[in-house]
Amino acid sequence: MNIQALLSEKVSQALTAAGAPADSEAQVRQSAKAQFGDYQANGVMAVAKKLGMPPRQLAEKVVQLLALEGIAEKTEIAGPGFINIFLDKQWVASQVENALNAPKLGLTPVEPQTIVIDYSAPNVAKEMHVGHLRSTIIGDAAARTLEFLGHNIIRANHVGDWGTQFGMLIAYLEKMQNESANEMDLSDLEAFYREAKKHYDEDADFAERARGYVVKLQGGDEYCRQMWRKLVDITMTQNQINYERLNVTLTKQDVMGESLYNSMLPNIVADLKAKGLAVESEGATVVFLDEYKNKEGEPMGVIIQKKDGGYLYTTTDIACAKYRYETLNADRVLYYIDSRQHQHLMQAWTIVRKAGYVPDSVSLEHHMFGMMLGKDGKPFKTRAGGTIKLSELLDEAYGRALKLIAEKNPQMESDELAALAKVVSIGAIKYADLSKSRTTDYVFDWDNMLAFEGNTAPYMQYAYTRVASIFKRAGIQEDTLTQPITLNDEREFALATRLLQFEETITSVAREGTPHVMCSYLYDLAGLFSGFYEHCPILNAENDDVRQSRLRLALLTAKTLKQGLDTLGIETVDKM
């Protein structure tokens, strides 16, 4: 049930009946304060201005024509023409019943789209580091959310698996295998990469061999392809361990690296030339874009092929967008890439649109994000200024969570403690990021993220166990609750109304790619449940009808918290 959508439709109908143009916006919003009702329609002022009519007069006309019988208890006009809508308690109670009994908490079924989500994108022969964290967990939350709504999701892990560095990596892998009879496991990819680079810089014969391998690899040489595949496989096997630890849904089957588009690049350059979009300039092939100007105010040149015949990231990104539309049949493509890549992506997509590779009906969206900073406000690094490996960050989170939980639960068995620390530590890292607006930089702070108070994963996980434990404690099965829901106390009504706003929240998250909106909703919901729990006795209610009604409200709260956290990729536990 999407109350906002329902009320928007009703207010729009009343506006049209009152003489407003058919496309007039109702601007229905959740009210910030209870005295202004549960929802507010703010669109009257703008429409009245268009009609040359006093806003209050139009508001009165709209209220008379509003068909909200059985939905709203009353409507009031406030100020110059705001319409405050107070929902009917019985109607809200009946909608809560529906949400409890329907699949997916009563969400309105969507028209399924094929949505490609580009996220994570680590590099081959390098270990994942904290810089990969935001794309990985924000992108995964988007994938889970849209999948839950009923869309067909294609996860695309745009791995950096191509480039001139592979000549040096293949040459070094060959050297290592010749020197060691054991099969390489590349347990420390960073050290492997550093050693390969050192040999390349210091050994002329090695460098010559490496350059030769680049040419052979690009020409499809079978030996080089085999060595290259080995490097990709070793890297992605190691990355998969990180994904599984993070409770991220990416698998090896989702790898769609840069190399996937290699065969398309010559044809794209030829086609852009044929269409008059690309021209030769100083030996390179360039697309000049009027939409972007250089310092002299002239159209900016975007190189798609270098003098030496090599291609650039832009060329690959053009091919990638074309492939996602033509081959994957995408209706919508979301890119979870940091904000520094914005202009690069916009230029690639401008070329894509001009060339007719992807129609305007297919949405290409850059869901950019800011940086992860340390407490000093600088990019998050080790004390020595080095990059923090993702696996080391996860190890530290686990160690901290284990210590914290052991202090709070000295009697807990060690295996139970370990399982709980795993769930809490991963939840804490993910929620700390997801609860901040993705477009801003955020400060990584261990103490805040592992706190059991405030808008944190441990607090949210505890809030869920608190609700779930009511049923456990009393030995109640949900199918034994048959009495209807009644909302006589204002706290019952506030909780019920907020529960029904789950669909509005998840719809907004799906549209904008903003998981922090879900985090805020869940935190607010947990707070409302806390107030309800303290002031409205559940198991000790005055009679069985009230007891069952409150238990059913608690049940929907538990289901909503669990489902909401699941869309973020955060697990819940039954005991904390």
Swiss-Prot record:
It is an enzyme of class 6 (ligase). It is found in: Cytoplasm. GO terms for molecular function: arginine-tRNA ligase activity; ATP binding. A motif ('HIGH' region) lies at residues 122-132. Its EC number is 6.1.1.19. PANTHER family: ARGININE--TRNA LIGASE, CYTOPLASMIC, ARGINYL-TRNA SYNTHETASE. Belongs to the class-I aminoacyl-tRNA synthetase family. This is Arginine--tRNA ligase. It comes from Pectobacterium atrosepticum (strain SCRI 1043 / ATCC BAA-672) (Erwinia carotovora subsp. atroseptica).
